[in-house]
């Protein structure tokens, strides 16, 4: 009550922010006449003037009024579009490390040009982040004329581009690309083997479009670069045959409930649990199939990988549905993004789940992958010096943006008042009744010429509605992950009178639905349109536009509520843009996932009390409130999951930053010999300590063990026992110094053979390769630790603290292993004089020719077995083109002495 009273007196924080910014908008507006007087050249010259002022030490914020006025004037000249005052407000919000909530149709793309231009003046680069490649390309090409008019360069960062093209895109003042591609480039840069391979600059300013989709919906999805692990596709196929024998039961066994099934599914946490009966049956079936021996337990340590296969297969069958979670196209399982309904080509589920789904669908099973590098979007975007974002729906997630990303949310007012009618939800008992009611609503709306957009939450549901519309004889377009190539074209014409469009979730986001359809799309379809044709198209469009407005504008139908209110608001936001008329309504049934899992008992009880008849709907504020509460519950739960994920990932993130920082330093220096000498001392000290404990009696020394270790791990054959026999006065410290001196001497002799430059290059290569290999193993170990750490809670220990403690000790152990592996590899490398390598190469060639002739003869004799044996023999002797060169340079054979071939 007190807070409400204070807000009334002083205004909310949002109001105060906007009041402050409106003063700057007035200054920008006052500059407009002055800007209009400037010639094109003078206007372009402003960019160089601003940069010069920044170099002299002026603060970027001081340039806002003039810079924004310049962009507005340039936009008028290039596009014939003038930034509204609310767009200037949005631009200021985005410059202040905030999230701007701007309704659909308010011109977010044009708004973004203001902060993008301002921050590009620093010369450090601006990354505009979009949700898909189409939008990145569209926005870059649309805004390129404006930025180039003002003397700035524009780059597009797309998947599959060669490194030089990517480097050029990142070197541009403003770069457009997708969140995935920026993240993957960051990971790839941190796996590079030379500074020239890196493409990104220092991360300066990110301007994220559809920020809620990227920073919240995809926050739980880590970006992973992986390499192939061992092939186990046969096992997935064998386990897959067993799963159909199992029966699902509704809930888990407990003291009060004993089911008849073999497994239960927890839809909330998306987990599958075997019952006692299920475990017994699985073990019997595994024995029967010859996968497991009689009397063995599935939970024994020896069968841990088998348990992994069973769990993956169970999840694939019970939790993942074709045309909802994935589609099968050209013999490949392609994931469908649950938030956007788009297919995610090239993305794969981890933990063997993707292989299990491939086995279930009977397509070719691809190898499992091993993580080489990974990062979550939460941690990637926090690497930028300055982060901002815009979306039509952020206010419901303002707390999360603030607590995780330290970004405030500012709701920017609309240019014209919103007049859309949001009708109350209608709840039916069954799915069939609900679909029937939707069809009737569509018939009514289209009869009076009103366009309708039907939003569904999966491909399966969109096809179900489509089939019913076809049966009813209603012409319509379907927009889902299966056909998203023509997405923008369908969305652009969804405002046509009486048009019916079915869209999965937020497919087509970023393209405005214009009432009456898009006249620009019609003009673009003509080869060489004349001025008369364009005028006629515009006139026809105006008639259609007015007709649609008179019919009530675009009508939105939601076929069920999403887990998040924000996604529902996004669907509603497609209607009522720029003060247009419009309406929306959600149709629900008690069989919908959200109602079934979170709101069923209360609402179905209410419906029973009201004595509902088939086909009847309940429409009451109580029901709408109960559903909103259910959504809040899910949102809160998902927020907790994301927050917890971040807390755990923060531990890995600190380690990742340390490793990548060291790796980049290593890449940028050409001579690492000082580092090598330093770690050699540490490694030899630790090795000797293990056999000659410091300040111990000679009787406690294990000299044979030390000699063997030095020989095996460092290729050092030292007569230590002989030294001690001949020199009784040789004490511990002197002995340590002598062993280290001998190792340095042997190493220096190798360096003399190959030359200092070659040795420096080789040292750097070994350090980078060893670091990458150990980091990869460390990531896998961290993943295993993370999966089981919650069990520490049963021992009254805080899992998070335990994870921090253990992961730190694992990290320290990894760094020690790094030192040891590097020195061991460098010590064991065999070097030869160039003449020796040439001689060996000559011998190898002669031997290869001789064997090839023999092989030819054996082929003529059709003795394939002998040929195979010879081929194997040849393979043993030959140095592979990608193998390390025998000279010990550290280069690949094909880039060193292999060039002689």
Curated annotation (Swiss-Prot):
Residues 859-901 are annotated as: Disordered. It comes from the Bacteria. It is a peripheral membrane protein. Induction: Repressed under conditions of excess protein secretion capacity and derepressed when protein secretion becomes limiting. This is regulated by SecM. Signal peptide: none annotated. Zn(2+) binds at residues 885, 887, 896-897. Keywords: ATP-binding, Cell inner membrane, Cell membrane, Cytoplasm, Membrane, Metal-binding, Nucleotide-binding, Protein transport, Translocase, Translocation, Transport, Zinc. InterPro entries: Helicase_ATP-bd, Helicase_C-like, P-loop_NTPase, SEC_C_motif, SecA, SecA_CS, SecA_DEAD, SecA_motor_DEAD. GO terms for molecular function: ATP binding; metal ion binding; protein-exporting ATPase activity. Its main location: membrane. It is found in: Cell inner membrane; Cytoplasm. Its EC number is 7.4.2.8. Pfam families: P-loop_SecA, SEC-C, SecA_DEAD, SecA_PP_bind, SecA_SW. GO terms for biological process: intracellular protein transmembrane transport; protein import; protein targeting; protein transport by the Sec complex. Its cofactor is Zn(2+). GO terms for cellular component: cell envelope Sec protein transport complex; cytosol; plasma membrane. It catalyses: ATP + H2O + cellular proteinSide 1 = ADP + phosphate + cellular proteinSide 2. Monomer and homodimer. Part of the essential Sec protein translocation apparatus which comprises SecA, SecYEG and auxiliary proteins SecDF-YajC and YidC. Part of the Sec protein translocase complex. Interacts with the SecYEG preprotein conducting channel. Has a central role in coupling the hydrolysis of ATP to the transfer of proteins into and across the cell membrane, serving both as a receptor for the preprotein-SecB complex and as an ATP-driven molecular motor driving the stepwise translocation of polypeptide chains across the membrane. This is Protein translocase subunit SecA. It comes from Escherichia coli O6:H1 (strain CFT073 / ATCC 700928 / UPEC). The gene is secA.
